[in-house]
């Protein structure tokens, strides 16, 4: 049997954060769970919400940490250990300030660019060899701080596009799981 892939959506728990930019990762893994016909349940050993099944023909564990974004590694590390998933088979889905709103980019390794959720995951996994599905949210307007911008809901113009963008991010995640990084990048990055 093939080794599972651990797909983790980053976000903050609680209804007050459910529709914020920082919760794009949660939103994408919710779509993937719906596609798989699976429901999230609390994983007792890690505390995260998990849904298991198959995606693109491979065994997959979807996860949403139930701690604040900056502490995500506290639950991602134990999940990777429990399911015997190597860091290279961990996919983190997250919001990305440094990518224009609506663009999806795939990446493996590299720096965390000030993203504290990624920093926490890298610390828990012993490095940043994991793969990433980066959902572009763009930079805040004017002199607004990135920290406050990511905790805001999408604006009224963005909200019209968000469902399509999240579906594309879910498609990109499926391609990454099915094809591996380079072929998936070639397809996804051609989307614009």
UniProtKB/Swiss-Prot annotation:
Species the sequence originates in: Mycolicibacterium vanbaalenii (strain DSM 7251 / JCM 13017 / BCRC 16820 / KCTC 9966 / NRRL B-24157 / PYR-1)
Primary location: cytoplasm
CDD domains, sorted: PTH
Protein name: Peptidyl-tRNA hydrolase
Keywords: Cytoplasm, Hydrolase, RNA-binding, tRNA-binding
EC annotation from Swiss-Prot or TrEMBL: 3.1.1.29
Binding site for tRNA: 17, 68, 70, 116
Assembly information from the UniProt record: Monomer.
């Amino acid at each position: 049997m093939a080794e599972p892939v651990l797909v983790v959506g980053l976000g903050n728990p609680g209804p007050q954060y459910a529709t914020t930019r920082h919760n794009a990762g949660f939103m994408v893994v919710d779509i993937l769970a719906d596609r798989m016909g699976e429901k999230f349940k609390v994983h007792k050993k890690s505390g995260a919400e998990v849904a298991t099944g198959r995606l693109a023909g491979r065994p997959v564990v979807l996860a949403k940490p139930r701690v604040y974004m900056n502490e995500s590694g506290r639950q991602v590390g134990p999940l990777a250990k429990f399911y015997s998933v190597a860091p290279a088979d961990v996919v983190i889905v997250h919001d990305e300030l440094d990518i224009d709103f609506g663009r999806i980019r795939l990446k493996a390794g590299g720096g965390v660019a000030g993203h504290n959720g990624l920093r926490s995951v890298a610390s828990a996994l012993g490095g940043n060899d994991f793969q990433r599905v980066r959902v572009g949210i763009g930079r805040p307007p004017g002199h607004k701080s990135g920290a406050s911008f990511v905790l805001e809901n999408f604006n009224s113009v963005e909200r019209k596009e968000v469902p399509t963008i999240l579906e594309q991010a879910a498609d990109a995640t499926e391609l990454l799981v099915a094809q591996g990084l380079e072929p998936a990048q070639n397809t996804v990055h051609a989307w614009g």
